[in-house]
């Protein structure tokens, strides 16, 4: 109903009441509490309560109809009075309540009995105690006329009011304590009252409505509004509403100092005071005629406003600085104002000069007037100067406005003070300039005054004011005396006064300006002061220059030129605000850390609130191995190295963390951590670490799993962590989703470690000086052409070349074994290198080295074998786990298989024996060269060639048993081979180009013969060195080591005995297959530099040995065979002479077109047993087999003279 317009509410209130019930507008709270507190009624909290009326007495039922009609008339007369004050836009819902005395007894007329009268009297007394008159009017409003609000008589009431004496009147209820005089409205109904009420209804409604609206609007201007300034001063909207109630209850015309009316009035007085303080000195000093109309009007208007302000100050509340409560009591306001600034304001507001002139003009004596005329004028000017005392009022108002601007617009208080000080200095300079001219004028311009000396007596007032102002500012700024030094005594004293005032103002200005400048960048000033103390400390202790420089760099990186007391600042904030700030400051850390990305947000917040920021310089040891750990660290920015004894260092970069292992195990540090760059870290103490993990057990399990994985990567174990993790796994504490999250965190940690290794290898690897022939193929076609000639292969085995050429690069070979290698295996594998290099026999002459086919080199390159450092980007990555079929499970060969290879039964045992899983090292340059599919024959077991065991010097339990041979063409020497050597075969996918016709399925003999391969380069054979004229024996394959996680690759110039490889080429998901265009392009690049093979080599290719029909045509033994066995017996188990391409199918000859003339050959690789088609030309075919024991013809290569 409160949302209805006032006219409709008045109509609803004037409706006739029901007989059995009556509607009452009441507050939900108790009326007595509301009135006692003087509180404001909230219209939205009102509700309608229906109170049942007592049934009329039987004796009073006779006159029910008449009383009902009179009640309706009284209700009509009551409506306007009640509705006049219901619509209050200002919330002014004040009430004055009272009680009505009944005008007649409840008994019936002449027929009423005494008992009936007594019964009616009781009900009438209960009715009288009800609240009837609820007028909503302010204390200043007129009371409701009695004739307008008459209580409707109850049904059955008697028409003769004088039949019985009226009952005693209800005593008036006390109104609010803040009201001056409580009142009681008593409405008396007389005969004809309803008619009188009907006659005055329209006029009273209009008059009361207009008066109430104006009073409410004006009253709202005297109360504090709900704005930004009031909310900051009082704290909340409820407090502002309570202050509004205090203003209404304080009395009539009490003005709140924060009200809108006082705000605009102060603004008007401020402008008027500034005008007076500027215009009045100029008018008094430079204008002699002060009786002009504009001057009089200006003074009268100004004085009138100041007198009104003087009166309003007695009704305006006073703000006490030491107390939050504002004084609103009129008596206290009056006493406090009289004791403070009343006298000064009164004197500055009274027109004393005009009063003096009026008094003086009443004297009729002409002589007196003539004698006193000049003195009267002078005295009047002096009295006019009393208006300048309004400066005190200006200062008070400016001070209030400083608070308003500071609270409302957040302006710096120092800036406001500077502006006020500048304005005050300019005003004092203005007054001083007027004073410099006023004093000589009051003395009638003596000859020694500066005005007479400069002949400025009769000049215009503008020129006089300009020179006077110049003279005054020269004195106040202490820069001179103006045009000339003072001569007369009055000028001397005025000059001294100006100097004193000016020096004081100048000192105040310098002080405020200095404070303002310092407050603009206090954090930088604090940093500079702190660093000055540090410099004095370093000088006092005579620290060396390098230490001083490190301290200087630390301060620059740690504080970056600004210093804050961050702990104190965050400690003063609330908990939600502090968490929000910390989350914002650590947003980069959270974004770069997978641990936080997969964790609960509450865990992240709890962890971040306990972090402490630290900075470390390059070379600082953050933690040391063997010490007791008290902190763990999170890397926000920087690179650190994890150093362990006997293992290669590990790099950690942005988003990683370390130092958690000893916090979990409560032990000592398992590794040292050194900062490589400037590192910005966040540390977490052990107490806070355990406190957070107690609330989040899943994150404790994640920390333990990652710590166990990290220990495994550096070759260490911790039984406590292992027991905890296994216990959690067995107990099933965590569900599947939580386990998946933990596994994701562990996987992210591994990937970040691998990324750090790749970054380290790319940033810190320095290439060793090697011949141009070892330069990678991708750098220059000419270098690639030189690297693929037969000279490159011959240089590999030349005995007179320096050993530095064949030394493995820093990032490859045995020097960079992965974390999985233990020191025991490392020493054992390193012991094989000197003997292998020392016993290797070179080729008889470079001319005896044949040029192998391009297919063999591509196969070996794509198979994932080790390569020199220059070829490391081109090598495929190996999987972190052994691929399917690594354990030697046989599978049926398919006709479409391109190459048949051998695998090792029981390779998984050999893999585990070497310790640790193989980590992958990806290279972006490698993905186009990886084969698109694995050959199904890769997992097919095949017999080991003769002499395939015993050459590596490995323990017998590491080597698998030789599988049974399925090749019908295997020689008897192959069956009787001595055990002890290892044969490994790798398979690649078919490498064919669009020019290559489809191949037919291979016979079983070819599958069995594919087990042959090249022996490890540099390994010592069992027998002696055989001359190169012996027929080649069954070659041995080359066990290649996969790339490590650190990015290192094995060298082809040293035997890579670091670890066994998986027996087939692993393929990563999403890797595109090798495109034939890449091979064709390589062929076209080299074809110009090497146009054709030597003719002798072409002739030799047409010859084939019967015993070599089962061998792969891509197998090239590079060393002379040991022993003097001939033919294909292979009983000696040694290495054969420099090999030639042999046909894979008997009865066919091998042809090499010109396009395949070693053009696309990579740098020399160790040769393996494999077979592939020729890229860029027709398939290679085998020539007729040569007789057993026939000596192969030596092939002399035609090399350019520059090589």
Swiss-Prot record:
Which residues are noted in the entry as 3',5'-cyclic AMP-binding? Answer: 659-660, 662, 669-670, 673, 710
Q: Which PROSITE patterns match?
A: CNMP_BINDING_1, CNMP_BINDING_3
Q: Where is the composition biased (Gly residues)?
A: 105-117, 1122-1137
Q: How does it sit in the membrane?
A: Multi-pass membrane protein
* Residues annotated to bind 3',5'-cyclic GMP: 559, 562, 564, 566
Function of the protein: Hyperpolarization-activated ion channel that are permeable to Na(+) and K(+) ions with very slow activation and inactivation. Exhibits higher selectivity for K(+) over Na(+) ions. Contributes to the native pacemaker currents in heart (If) that regulate the rhythm of heart beat. Contributes to the native pacemaker currents in neurons (Ih). May mediate responses to sour stimuli.
* Description of its domains: Contains six transmembrane segments (S1-S6) and an intervening P-loop. The segment S4 is the voltage-sensor and is characterized by a series of positively charged amino acids at every third position, while the S5-S6 segments together with the P-loop form a centrally located pore of the channel. Contains a cyclic nucleotide-binding domain (CNBD) in their C-terminal region. The CNBD is connected to the pore forming transmembrane segment via the C-linker. Contains a unique pocket located in the cytosolic C-terminal domain, identified as a likely binding site for di-cyclic nucleotides.
Q: Which protein, by its recorded name, is this?
A: Potassium/sodium hyperpolarization-activated cyclic nucleotide-gated channel 4
Tell me the name of the encoding gene: HCN4
